[in-house]
Amino acid sequence: VSRGLGDVYKRQVYDYNMKFADAWQHEADQVSLFIFDEEGNYLKEMNISAEEARRNNILLDLQPGTYQILAWTGLNSDDYLCLAPADRTNSRIKDYSVRMNAEAQNVDRDLVPLFYGMQTVTIPDAATSDIRFPLMKDTNTFRLIIQADANNTSSSVPSDEFEFSITDNNALLAYNNTAVTEELPLTYSPYYLGDGDIHDPEGNVVLTTTCAELNTNRLIYGTHPRLTIRHKTTGKVWLNVDLIEYIMLMPTEGSLDKMLDREHPQQEYLDREDEYVIVFFFTQSSNGNMINVRITINGWTVRINNIEM
């Protein structure tokens, strides 16, 4: 790209993850930019294709001055709706938000990742500028697995026996990426539900596990999304817990020590982590009921009170 005097280039960076390393080239997608003046008055919108986003050298065509830049990815998909005034002439940055596209308040599909960024930038006179623009990933992936405990390997768990869901008030994210909790709650259901076989050294199937995968929008520390697992045959709710409290049960102290925001390390952790693998181990009681004896979250074991079903 030929650079001219006074040109301003924007470079996306996605290092707000648990590896603290830039993964934008792996995640790059279409980017929608909304540009406002220093007071937050709307100036213009730019839509950057995925190919251009991967090149990561976006010419902004801005005059010297101070601007507020708002960015989202994924707005070109069917998963999200950008809410903004039809006539943007007199609109302000606070008028912009993104809503999850949900039918009957239920989301049961593999979502296009939603990335968010907002930054105030000052462009100097007559100088070529490079703007480093950090992004945050709002979309989370949960893999929920139910399997027999090591001492109860004769038991199997067919996937059609369970219903999984996460309920949260995070359908609408404001311009500053906070959830508008006055909205109706969303129920996130699996986009994948299936069985997985575990084999012995000879290759024989020794047990079958249930695996569910689902996505959620951004998790906000201090809110109370619910993770629910229901047994279809009995109709009994096997698990109904505060999801964020469960996540924080694992030994996060070491991870929290790495966080840069010393005042809000829990929120930073939730924003950096975007994949959670939660395994529920069970044994069977003498009457044949399933008893949940322990769970692991991203490899960390959490002991819990027995939950019988």
What kind of region is each of these model predictions?
Residues 1-9:
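Single conserved hydrophobic/aromatic residue that forms the stacking wall/gate
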Residues 29-83, 155-260, 309:
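Tryptophan-paired
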Residues 13-26, 145-156:
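Structural motif
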Residues 130-154, 160-162:
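Loop-centered beta-sheet repeat module
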Residues 124-128, 201-202, 252-253, 273:
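Solvent-exposed, conformationally flexible loop/turn segments
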Residues 234-295:
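C-terminal structured domain segments
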Residues 41-138:
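Short, low-hydrophobicity acidic/polar segments
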Residues 296-309:
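Short, low-complexity, Pro/Ser/Thr/Gly-rich segments in the mature regions of secreted, periplasmic
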